[in-house]
């Protein structure tokens, strides 16, 4: 029997591109784990993807995962676009290279390790897990910019 895990993810960027951060809150059997990180020059979409990738990478064995995001980009990529990108060799319908293909490929690899269901929530509406992930993403931005949080 595999563990059931909820992962709440968020990305943040100060400028787009600019310094960015990602955050993931993992919850399993009432135990929480916080993850965050950042990059000096990135985009909000890359940080949204990184949050999901890092959250899934943290799981050491196959799990039933509910991944909760406020990113329409991540949701549409996973549910609508990725299958066709893969069929076309990571090209769009216009035969252009898929933006962030490196991260989409990493996410695809991680998703295939688990049984993942995806849930979209509207950001900044008081959803506890989403708000925590947002705080973690902003911590990632702050650390990249040289601000340390207590």
Curated annotation (Swiss-Prot):
| Gene3D superfamilies tied to this protein | Ribonuclease H-like superfamily/Ribonuclease H
Which EC class is the enzyme in?
hydrolase
Q: Which GO terms describe its biological process?
A: DNA replication, removal of RNA primer
Task: Please list the residues that bind Mg(2+) 1.
Answer: 10, 48, 70
**InterPro entries per the UniProt record, alphabetical:** RNase_H, RNaseH-like_sf, RNaseH_domain, RNaseH_sf, RNaseHI
Task: Name the positions where Mg(2+) 2 binds.
Answer: 10, 134
Query: What are the protein's UniProt keywords?
Result: Cytoplasm, Endonuclease, Hydrolase, Magnesium, Metal-binding, Nuclease
- State its location(s): Cytoplasm
Write down the EC number.
Answer: 3.1.26.4
Give the catalytic activity: Endonucleolytic cleavage to 5'-phosphomonoester
A Pfam family cross-referenced in the UniProt record is RNase_H
Q: What GO CC annotations are associated with the protein?
A: cytoplasm
Note on how the cofactor is bound: Binds 1 Mg(2+) ion per subunit. May bind a second metal ion at a regulatory site, or after substrate binding.
Instruction: Give a GO molecular function annotation for the protein.
Output: magnesium ion binding
Q: Which cofactor does it need?
A: Mg(2+)
Span of domain RNase H type-1 = 1-142
> What exactly does this protein do?
Endonuclease that specifically degrades the RNA of RNA-DNA hybrids.
Task: Write down the NCBIfam families for this protein, in alphabetical order.
Answer: PRK00203.1
Summarize the subunit comment.
Monomer.
Family stated for the protein in its record: Belongs to the RNase H family.
What protein name is recorded for this chain?
Answer: Ribonuclease H
Species for this entry: Pseudomonas fluorescens (strain ATCC BAA-477 / NRRL B-23932 / Pf-5)
Q: What is the lineage of its organism?
A: Bacteria, Pseudomonadati, Pseudomonadota, Gammaproteobacteria, Pseudomonadales
Task: Give the gene that encodes this protein.
Answer: rnhA
